[in-house]
């Protein structure tokens, strides 16, 4: 092996004389070394022990220096002195000749220093290390790429503040830029990085790069010692320079608390207990105010209350007791005359029959028991301007009472009929000079007595209709035409509430009319019974023919109730075919209106009467049905 190495060295040494300069020799040596290793892998050189470049740096971008390591000697042979050669490329890309290092001393041992005369910032450099003419190491670079500023100088710190607990403190660290860096002219722009740690720790805490020469450091523990370092780099570069000298920061203890461990305020524990306490208080409040809150959210439904009635009766379902209480309670009784502020009542003494013709007829008329006609209800009083005090409710009550006792008073019916006849002729008893007073034959009186003995059934209409028929007979008399203005006097009021009117002067007809009317009514009542709704055919035929046999100067016009009264057309046709009584009346004149309906009460002494519709003779039947109304009946009757 040593022989092969010796032969190779001699060959190389001999060939080196044929080249001028050292560059080809170094290249040949390098290629020869690789060739020997490829031929014999076991043959190795000591290239791994040769010197290497460690770094090249420019502190201020105006000068730069390069450093390398020492060579390691193995065996008896040494490499010889180490030399550095450099070259620069021009703009055209041509490489200049190699030149040796200008200064091996200024930058220190194993270094080469290039001052500003040998430094070009924008021109690339290539350097190499040689030993005994052989190239050991080489590299190429530009000055901009190797800029590494010097460490900052003059580091110090200032205490900013201490926390309220005295555990932490804040400081401000200051320094100065490297003196050889042209910062003021802007030839270089530096960025600084600060790192700190506690003395006994190994991990450094780095802060973000800054452009200023001061930076605050927060939350340093009191009574601890810290190490602070600062380094710089050119902006937009990756290569930091060397760290500055270590700055030691010692914060004195400000209070009695020891700073061995951090004191953390138990915020989480306080929040948990606070929420729990608020929840307990809320539940206590809701429990204590449960009823009040329930009433606010769900107000109770008011229970229906009736004055004077125990609500328990309604709950238990005792409706009989509730109805009994409502019936006897004053506040639930029906109130009459609710719309009238005051009501006048005129008392009528009907217990003294001897005094019936005495006193004011108008006072009797204004009593509360005489009104039944519907034309008088609801008419306003001329004096007070209010509605009449004669209400239909009270009158209907009286009429119902009369209808109820009608069946039980059959014994007193003849006396009542006789009393009505007396009332009709009340104003004619004192007419002694009347030519008709003696005209009433004595043979007619037994008929009246016979009618009283037969106990006739109740008439289909009430006492008012009977009185109406009597009054109509009197008005139909031609002799009473001169006295029609005096039919505003009330002779009497029947127990059933009917009003009996009489002329103001003596009637010339005398008692004959009264007797004949009473006899006619007795005959009609003696033959048939009439109800409140209908007339039968047979009864109508019996009652209607009576009129032609009465030989007086007036005719009796049948008057029927206007409500629900019907008779057959066959009976009316038969009756209408017979000769009427008007044919036998000598000197008949125009019929006189029947003033038996009170229109309005002007004063206690004055009445205004309504005239009923006059019968129109010669009317024919217009209806072809089996029944006709009472209006049509009154028009066609003779």
From Swiss-Prot:
This is Growth hormone receptor. Residues 19-264 are extracellular. SUPFAM superfamilies: Fibronectin type III (SSF49265). Belongs to the type I cytokine receptor family. Type 1 subfamily. It is found in: Cell membrane. Receptor for pituitary gland growth hormone (GH1) involved in regulating postnatal body growth. On ligand binding, couples to the JAK2/STAT5 pathway. GO terms for molecular function: cytokine binding; growth hormone receptor activity; peptide hormone binding. Residues 353-388 are annotated as: Disordered. Residues 151-254 form the Fibronectin type-III domain. On growth hormone (GH) binding, forms homodimers and binds JAK2 via a box 1-containing domain. A motif (UbE motif) lies at residues 340-349. A motif (Box 1 motif) lies at residues 297-305. The gene is GHR. Residues 289-638 are cytoplasmic. GO terms for biological process: cytokine-mediated signaling pathway; endocytosis; growth hormone receptor signaling pathway; positive regulation of cell population proliferation; positive regulation of receptor signaling pathway via JAK-STAT. The chain crosses the membrane at residues 265-288. Residues 294-379 are annotated as: Required for JAK2 binding. It is a single-pass type I membrane protein. The modification Phosphotyrosine is found at residues 487, 595. Keywords: Cell membrane, Disulfide bond, Endocytosis, Glycoprotein, Membrane, Phosphoprotein, Receptor, Secreted, Signal, Transmembrane, Transmembrane helix, Ubl conjugation. It comes from Macaca mulatta (Rhesus macaque). GO terms for cellular component: cytosol; external side of plasma membrane; extracellular region; growth hormone receptor complex.
């Amino acid at each position: 092996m040593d022989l092969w190495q010796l032969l190779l060295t001699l060959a190389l040494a001999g060939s080196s004389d044929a080249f001028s300069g050292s560059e080809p020799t170094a290249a040949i040596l390098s290629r020869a070394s690789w060739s020997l290793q490829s031929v014999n892998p076991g043959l190795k050189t000591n290239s791994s022990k040769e010197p290497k470049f460690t770094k090249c740096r420019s502190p201020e971008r105006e000068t730069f220096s390069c450093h390398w390591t020492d060579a390691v000697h193995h065996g008896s042979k040494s490499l010889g002195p180490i030399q550095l050669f450099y070259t620069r490329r021009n703009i055209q890309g041509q490489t200049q000749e190699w030149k040796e290092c200008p200064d091996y001393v200024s930058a220190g041992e194993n270094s080469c220093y290039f001052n500003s005369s040998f430094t070009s910032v924008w021109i690339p450099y290539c350097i190499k290390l040689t030993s005994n003419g052989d190239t050991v190491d080489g590299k190429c670079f530009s000055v901009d790429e190797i800029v590494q500023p010097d460490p900052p100088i003059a580091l110090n710190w200032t205490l900013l503040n201490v926390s309220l607990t005295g555990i932490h403190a804040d400081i401000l660290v200051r320094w100065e830029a490297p003196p050889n860096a042209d910062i003021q002219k802007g030839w270089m722009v530096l960025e600084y990085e600060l790192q700190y740690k506690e003395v006994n720790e190994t991990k450094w805490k780095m802060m973000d790069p800054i452009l200023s020469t001061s930076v605050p450091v927060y939350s340093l523990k009191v009574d601890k010692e810290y190490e602070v370092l600062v380094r710089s780099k050119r902006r937009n570069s990756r290569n930091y320079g060397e760290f500055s000298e270590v700055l030691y920061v010692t914060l004195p203890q400000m209070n009695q608390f020891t700073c061995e461990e951090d004191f953390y305020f138990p915020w989480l524990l306080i929040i948990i207990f606070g929420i729990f306490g608020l929840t307990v208080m809320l539940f206590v409040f809701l429990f204590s105010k449960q009823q009040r809150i329930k009433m606010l959210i769900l107000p109770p439904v008011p229970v229906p209350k009736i004055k004077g009635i125990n609500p328990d009766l309604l709950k238990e379902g005792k409706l009989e007791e509730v109805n009994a209480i409502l019936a006897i309670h004053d506040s639930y009784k029906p109130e009459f005359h609710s719309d009238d502020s005051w009501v006048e009542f005129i008392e009528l003494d009907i217990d003294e029959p001897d005094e019936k013709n005495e006193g004011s007829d108008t006072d009797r008329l204004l009593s509360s028991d005489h009104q039944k006609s519907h034309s008088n209800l609801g008419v306003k009083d001329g004096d007070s301007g209010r509605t009449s005090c004669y209400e239909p409710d009270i009158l209907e009550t009286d009429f119902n009472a009369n209808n109820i006792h009608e069946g039980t008073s059959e014994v007193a019916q003849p006396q009542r009929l006789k009393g009505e006849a007396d009332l009709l002729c009340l104003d004619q008893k004192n007419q002694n000079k009347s030519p008709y007073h003696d005209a009433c034959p004595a043979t007619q009186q037994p008929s009246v007595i016979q009618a009283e003995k037969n106990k006739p059934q109740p008439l289909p209409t009430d006492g008012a209709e009977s009185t109406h028929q009597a009054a109509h007979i009197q008005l139909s008399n031609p002799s009473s035409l001169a006295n029609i203005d005096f039919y505003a006097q009330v002779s009497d009021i029947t127990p059933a509430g009917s009003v009996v009117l009489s002329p103001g002067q003596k009637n010339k007809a005398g008692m004959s009319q009264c007797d004949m009317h009473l006899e006619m009514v007795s005959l009609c009542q003696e033959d048939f019974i009439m109800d409140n709704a209908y007339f039968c055919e047979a009864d109508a035929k019996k009652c209607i023919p009576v009129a032609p046999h009465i030989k007086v100067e007036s005719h009796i016009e049948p008057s029927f109730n206007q409500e629900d009264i019907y008779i057959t057309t066959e009976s009316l046709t038969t009756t209408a075919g017979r000769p009427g009584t008007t044919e036998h009346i000598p000197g008949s004149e125009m019929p006189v209106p029947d003033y038996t309906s009170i229109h309005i009460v002007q004063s206690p002494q004055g009445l205004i009467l309504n005239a009923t519709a006059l019968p129109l003779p010669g009317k024919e039947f217009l209806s072809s049905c089996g029944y006709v109304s009472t209006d049509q009946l009154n028009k066609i009757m003779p």
